[in-house]
């Protein structure tokens, strides 16, 4: 799967994305999804891995999905959640767009991808 950087990132989308990960449990969930990469994780696996109650996890996954930082896909009777690397890279690009104030940055052109 190709990991493009979302170059059409708006301030509103940046705020929504940052708000989604500005909560400790959601940040931990998002980081676990990033580590899982393309294979993703089921809510059950996430709940067990992070020791989070399923009802609480459901709320956090809904918020991450709404923000665009995560997506879900039905696989049989399970939902598989994945980090949206294009959205994550778009957020990073938006935040660092003017980081070097005109000088060349050493940031990787391709951004972050699944391990």
PLM ranges: what are they?
Residues 9-53, 75-87:
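N-terminal helix-turn-helix DNA-binding core of bacterial DNA-binding proteins
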Residues 61-62:
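Short, hydrophobic-biased segments on the C-terminal half of alpha helices
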Residues 48, 65-66:
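Alpha-helical residues within the helix-turn-helix
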Residues 1-13, 34-35, 85-115:
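Amphipathic alpha-helical dimerization/coiled-coil segments
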